Design a protein with these regions (language model features):
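Rossmann-like NAD(P)-binding element
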Residues: 32-35, 49-93
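NAD(P)+-binding Rossmann beta1-loop-alpha1 motif at the extreme N-terminus of oxidoreductases
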Residues: 1-50, 62
């Protein structure tokens, strides 16, 4: 299974995660606060109404409490537009 990490699980992070989930990826998610899985599921349903994913098997989502636990995979950052926060996260990676 292909893997991808998403840092930040706000609106954009949930949308990106939902798309990759429907494309069959194993997604590693890190968010400072508890991720809103209900909103993630809503994004999945919205995408399924707009795009035919019948040729794909659903992926898997893993929620991590610590950013250091993310796998060594392609990582998409979807944090707030706060330069200091982004620098802090990039230094950890």
């Amino acid at each position: 299974m292909k893997e991808i990490n998403i840092i930040g699980f706000g609106l954009m992070g949930r949308q990106i995660s939902a798309l990759f989930y429907l494309l069959g990826y194993e997604i590693g998610v890190y968010n400072k606060s508890k991720p809103n899985i209900y909103e993630f599921e809503k994004q999945i349903k919205l995408l399924q109404r707009k795009i035919d994913f019948s040729n794909f098997n659903a992926g898997k989502i893993n929620i991590y409490q610590h950013i250091e636990d993310l796998k060594n995979s392609l990582t998409i950052e979807s944090l707030n537009e706060d330069l200091n926060l982004k620098k802090e996260i990039i230094q950890i990676l």
